[in-house]
Amino acid sequence: VLSLPSLTGCAIDKGTALASDFEENWAGTPDVAKIHTTKNNTLPFKGSSTGTLILKDGTSADRVTKLVGEMREYVARHDKITGRIAADGITFTVVADKGRTGQVLALWRSLTADDRVADADINDEPWKEATDRWRIEVTAVDATGALAVFKDMYAKGDRHRPLAGVMVLRVRGPGLFVESDFNDGFPAEAIAAYEAVLAQYPVVGATLRRDAVSGSAVSIVVAEGVDRDDAVELARSAAPNLGTAVEVTSDSAG
């Protein structure tokens, strides 16, 4: 993509000017259905922008790869612009580093090939000197798929290759929300608690979220009529280090 001459540097609302530049630079790009931009005018003459290329349905993987390469070069020249691409239900950030962008592209390919995945967002969230920080959010088609995808994202060499520097991973599906623990790791005990109850009783819904005190917290809703006390015992026995951070309630609505 060509970079057009810009007066961004002397714009009072720099974020607005950056967004305008992005739209102009990428306008008319083949296979791009829409361009979405956001602008952040932090202070006079200072700001940033995020630009997302929303690709046409059916855009080939080879074409996506080519556009990713062009976007990587673009953001390398425009450090106040965050470049993103949305293709096949997966939206992801493209960074200037070739290796990191290659990892994200590989994850995009595997997620789009996974029929358990409905959509996903892979976002770069650098903080101070820590540049390798990713936030990944995935929506799965059902609870079983959500847990399986979550596990696969942590399994080295399995279906989805993990990214380096993931800050938080969240996967949700109807009846389940699960995220990495407070130390950005695999919440083994939280998942064990959920699976222990699921193996014995029908589960209406569950939330396995990060918790600053225990690392993870578990909330499980079992079907009405289930022996809740037994379900609590099952869950807490499977996750002894979480203690009262594991809760089980009954679905009173049936």
Each predicted region: which residue ranges?
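Extracytoplasmic/luminal low-complexity segments enriched in Pro/Gly and acidic/polar residues
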Residues: 184-254
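Short edge beta-strands and adjacent turn/loop segments
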Residues: 31-52, 120-132, 203-220
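Long, acidic/polar, low-complexity amphipathic helices and coiled-coil-like
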Residues: 48-50, 65, 75-176
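C-terminal motif of bacterial Sec signal peptides marking the signal peptidase cleavage site
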Residues: 6-9
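N-terminal Sec/ER secretory leader and immediately downstream segment
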Residues: 18, 22-92
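Short amphipathic alpha-helices in soluble, non-transmembrane regions
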Residues: 25, 63-74, 111, 148-157, ...
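Bacterial signal peptide processing site
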Residues: 11-14
